[in-house]
Amino acid sequence: MMGKLPLGVVSPYVKMSSGGCTDPLKFYATSYCTAYGREDFKPRVGSHRGTGYKSNYRPVVFYQPHLDALDNTATGEQGCNNFQTVTSQSYRPLEVPDGTHPLPWNLHQTNSGYSREKASAVTPIKEVRKVHFDTQDYGPQAITGLEPKDAPLLHQQQNKGSLEWENAGHGPRFMTSEYNSKYLKEPSHQPDLLQKNSVGAKEETGFTEESNKNPIVFQPPSQALPGDPVLLPGRSVTKSDFLPISHPHGDEFLPVLARGSERETGFSRVNERTLNPRVPPPCPEPSSMNHWQFQSPQRMQQTNVALLGRETVGNKEPSGFSLNNPSYVRSPYDPDMDNRYLTTYNQGYFENIPKGLDREGWTRGGLQPQKPGGYALNQPVTRLEATPTPTESLRRLHPHLGRTLISVDPFYRTAPPSGHVSRFTAPN
C-alpha cells in the first residue's frame, strides 16, 4: 500500500491553473502546459520569407515610358533615360547602315566598324599639351600664371634632390625622367687634348692579376714542363685546355700513321693500355700477310727495371672501399637466408618499417581487426531506459500533478509484492 502524498505549499501558478491535465498518457505535463495549454493545439504554418539577404532588398519598380504616353508626356520624356541600365546602354542592338550616315573623312578607314566610339588607351599629345607645359620650349616665365610656386615650410620637402625644386618648383621637365633630366651628363664639345683624358693599354682585372698561387697545384718553374698552365697561376685550366678553334692555313703536315698504331679507327691515335700486357691478345682467325705487317709487336719491350729483375707483381687485394666496410651481417628476419641487397646505408640506418607478420594488417587483402572510430567513440551507446515505476514517477512530479494522475487513473499505483494474494490494489 502506498502512503499519502505530501500536499505541500500551494504555489501561485497552481492557483492560476485551470485544472489538472486530463490526459493520462501525458506524463511530461509542465506548469506552462497546465496553465496556458490548449487541447489539440497545432502550430500555425508560417510562410517562407526567403533569406535575410533577399528580404533586405528594397522593391524595384521598373519604369516604362509608355505609362506616361497619354496623360503625362513631358514626364515620360524626362525619365526615359533615367531608368536605363548600364547593360542596355553599353550593349545595344545591332544597327545596319542604311546609307544616311555621313562618309568618313579618310578614304581608308583604319578603325573597326564594330564600335563607333574610338577607344584609345593612350592620351593624344594634343590633349597632354593643354594640361602640361613644356618648360624646355617656353620656360616658366614665358606663360602668364606659371610663376614659381611658393609652398608653406611644413609642406616643403627638405631632403636632397627633391623633384619639386626643378623648373622653378613645377617638377621635372616635360616627358623626361628624373635620372635623364638630373643625373645624365651631357657630352662635352671640347677636344680630348683639353679634357686631359688618356687611354692606356688593356690589362687584366684585379681578380686575375692579384690572385694568389695555389699551394696544391703550383710547382716551381724548375719542376714544371715548358708550356704547363701551372706556370701561369692567373690563367684558368679551362682556358689552357679548351683552346680556340684554329682554321688550317695550308702549311700543316699531312697526317701520318705512327708505328705500331691500329688502322681500325682514326678517332684516337693513342692506344689504350691493356690490363695484362705480357699475355698476347688471342687471335681467333689467321690474319693475312698484308694485315700482319701493320700489327703491333707481339712481344712487349721490357723496361730497364724489368731487365734488372726489380719489377715484381704482388697478389691481388681488395680495394679500400671493401676493406673499410663492416663485416657482413645476416638478415635478422631470416638468419638462414642471406640478404643479397644489404647495403652500408641499410646497416647504418635501420629501417623502421614493419615487415613479415607485423605488416599483415596493412597488406592488400589482409584481415584487419575492427577498431572503434571517432564517430563510435564520441557517440554514447544508445540504451533503452528501464520502465519507470509509478512510485518513482509520483515522487518526481509535482504534488498537484500526482493527485491528478491518481484521481484519473485509480490503478496508477505500485504493484504489491509477490507475497500478497491480490495483484491490484483497490483505490482509497
From Swiss-Prot:
Ranges where the record places region Disordered: 201-231
GO cellular component: axonemal A tubule inner sheath; cilium; cytoplasm; sperm flagellum
Annotated Pfam families: PPP1R32
Molecular functions (GO terms): phosphatase binding
GO biological process: flagellated sperm motility
Keyword set, alphabetical order: Cell projection, Cilium, Cytoplasm, Cytoskeleton, Flagellum
Main location group: other
Localization in the cell: Cell projection, Cilium; Cytoplasm; Cytoplasm, Cytoskeleton, Flagellum axoneme
InterPro entries, per database record: SAXO4
PANTHER family with a match to the protein in the record: PROTEIN PHOSPHATASE 1 REGULATORY SUBUNIT 32
Assembly notes: Microtubule inner protein component of sperm flagellar doublet microtubules. Interacts with PPP1CA.
Protein name in the entry: Stabilizer of axonemal microtubules 4
Lineage start: Eukaryota, Metazoa, Chordata, Craniata, Vertebrata
Gene: SAXO4
